[in-house]
Amino acid sequence: MSWNQYPGGGHHQQGGYGYRPPPPQWAQQGPPPPPNMGYRPPPPPQAYYNNPPPPQQYQRPAPQQNGYQQGGYQQQQQSQGNYRTSNGGYVPPTGAPVEASYHHTGAGYTPPSGTPQRTSAPYGAGAPIRPPSQAQHYGPQLQGQGGQSAQPYFQYSQCTGKKKALCIGINYVGSSSALAGCINDAHNVQKFLIERYGYKSEDIVMLTDDARNPRQIPTRANILAAMHWLVQGAQPNDSLFFHYSGHGGQTPDLDGDEDDGYDEVIYPLDFKTAGHIVDDDITDCKGRHNIMVRPLPAGCRLTAIYDSCHSGTALDLPYIYSTEGVIKEPNLLAEAGQGLLSAGMSYLRGDTGGMLQGIMGIGKKVMNQNSGAMEKARQTKTSPADVISWSGCKDSQTSADTQEAGRATGAMSYAFIAALTKYPQQSYVQLLNTIRDELKGKYDQKPQLSASHPMDTNILFIC
């Protein structure tokens, strides 16, 4: 079956990605936290659950019409054993779409209701404005083959085009490291996108380990296929949304592109047999898989939420922002030798001035001696697309699986929805602060904001 027949079909699965996380954080910092309070990397499960039972206290919702088709979907009888494909996707089981409400089948939480007291958050000055529509140029002129020069650029998405979403929730039912709130998170985010941002249920793919359709079980193959579906056919001003709630961890970095020596990983339901999924697999910054970031055109938005442990740089984006809206970790400095002469160097502050002069000199020498340096620059982690990632914690932290309003949930998923429910019109820096406020005093984790380009964090968050 070709890739066009099934997104990700025939997709090469990487070897060598066995379960090899470093010692858990609590090993050096005292006793482990209480059960279900952190999304730590799970130990190998006792068995792989092809057809897992519903988790306790979770009632299976009505079958949902979630397909991988580009322009809608067709209905198929659930009893059929073969899943025909059309336009690059499978056909989901039949059933009425879920109702557009936050609270589903008694399993999810109910975010704050009623009219918010104010539309914008108390951080920053005034109401945020929408992002500009024209291309944004930044950094120095780069010289390529034939003496031609060009300046790096990106384009904000207006989010007025096609809207597609992929929501993944894995409770690891029956395993020794089962979680309670991840399936709820996926359904609650789905409902939030439908109600607040105009997404359609037929354009949202759900992968949960209680699904009836085997193509909607969050195995490694299904997750990678769904990622392909999400970005397939992306156009400027489209809005794509990726949400993952489940176990996350770290594995030793083999090529030196991580400052802390570890790549970030997420754990599919079948990670023991199929392996985990590394951040580099998702971004294709090493040429391994062309999935989530590299295929996107300028002006296309991808919003990602990682509600998992060690997720600070889970999407491997180079610009990480502080609660003051400034770059706090200039990861691009490590990429100068690859031909990227500092996308957004003018945004870096503090004591990096002298260091930048040296890097610019090295970069200029590389550009003069290597005619392929421009291509190398295009293969780094920056992108002309508008890619934003919200993660539940720093790379060194765990992310809580907890309860809010008496319902099982991931702390980050809950905080994201609650913050935007209270204050629908927020800038990026405002939203980062209000998300942290939702968790302050209850959890140690610090949610992170990262981007594929230097951004104005005072513009309006849209998706």
UniProtKB/Swiss-Prot annotation:
Sequence ranges of Pro residues compositional bias: 20-56
Gene3D superfamilies named among the record's database cross-references: 3.40.50.12660
Compositionally biased region (Low complexity): 57-83
Region (Disordered): 1-149
One of the GO biological process terms: apoptotic process
GO cellular component, one term: cytoplasm
Biased composition (Gly residues): 7-18
Keywords: Apoptosis, Hydrolase, Protease, Thiol protease, Zymogen
Family, per entry: Belongs to the peptidase C14B family.
The protein's name in its UniProt record: Metacaspase-1
Organism per entry: Cryptococcus neoformans var. neoformans serotype D (strain B-3501A) (Filobasidiella neoformans)
Gene name for this UniProt entry: MCA1
